[in-house]
Every structure is written in structure tokens, then in C-alpha cells.
């Protein structure tokens, strides 16, 4: 049975107006992710955001394919995703959540400042789809502590606690050009 009234407005509790209904979780495609994160191929490790509750949690997806450069050397006869890249995927998902809340984000960078309790529980191989869930533990000014987990087909493959900090983006340095040789 539907919870929609005849005039197609959602049912509300007596204390709740339609404007106070919780918003649907936000999603992001790859272009929106790229507008937030400075990472690019081959180091952009989230493909899509499927859920996001501002300042609380984010769920992102990463599709693993044999075409990724790490599989050329890790390991050619048994390709598995390096654990450190899974932790980086957790940090990037958390970074997307954090930077989505930062005003003037083009003038900011997000630095990964710590990793705690990282555990790698199962190998990840080409063909797997990572579901990366990150939840805010503590958000203080520019620093955020987040707990992250990655599952494949509902099975936990990695979890870690990460800390990130927003810092001003330094001005680009223009190196002095060497003088042209004198003839």
C-alpha cells in the first residue's frame, strides 16, 4: 500500500510538514566527483556516489577492471587490488563528503593525515564492485575523523579509520626558466 495521498504529497506526521521531510540521499556521477576531488586517472578511485547524507555519511562505488595499471605488477599471474588503494578509496569517498560542505573548495586541498586500524579481510580482483561506506566519527573545524568499510557482494573486504584535513591550496609555483644559451 502506498504512503502517498490522493494529491500526490507524502504523508507526514502531525508534527511534520512536507517541507520538513528528510531529503533523499544525494548521488553524484563521475563529473560531479571530479569537480570535488583533485585526483585523476589512474588515481581517482571512486566512480559514483550512490548515497550521501551531508556531514554524516557517504556510499560510493568503484568498479575494478583488469585495465587498471596496478594489475600489471600486482600481481601479473594473480591480480589483486593493493590494500593501500582500498584505504585511499575510503579517504577519497570521505573527501568527497567533506569537500561537498566546504565553501570556496577550489581554493582548498584535502590532506589525508592518519590511518588507524586498517584491516584487509579478503582479496579484491578484477570484476569486483567495491561498495565504499564512510561515516563521520568526529568533525572539528577543518579536520574530520571517519570510519570506512568496503564490501564486495555484501562481504567485508577492508575497513579503516582515516583522518583528513582541509588546507588552503598553495599558489602554483612558476619555476624560473633557464636562460637561452648565448651564441
Would you name each region that the model predicts?
Residues 2-34, 158-183:
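Segments adjacent to and within acyl-thioester-processing domains across lipid
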Residues 3, 24-27, 94-131, 157-159, ...:
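Hydrophobic beta-strand-centered segment that forms part of the acyl-chain substrate-binding groove
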Residues 40-81:
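Catalytic strand-loop segment that frames the active site of acyl-thioester-processing enzymes
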Residues 49, 116-153:
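Hydrophobic beta-sheet segments that form the core/acyl-binding groove
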Residues 50, 56-65, 125-133, 158-161, ...:
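Terminal leader/tail segments of proteins
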Residues 54, 67, 139-141, 153-155, ...:
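Short coil/turn motifs at secondary-structure junctions
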Residues 65-99, 111-112:
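Compact, glycine-rich, soluble single-domain proteins
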Residues 79, 151, 155-157:
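Hydrophobic small-molecule pocket/channel-lining residues, especially in calycin-type beta-barrels
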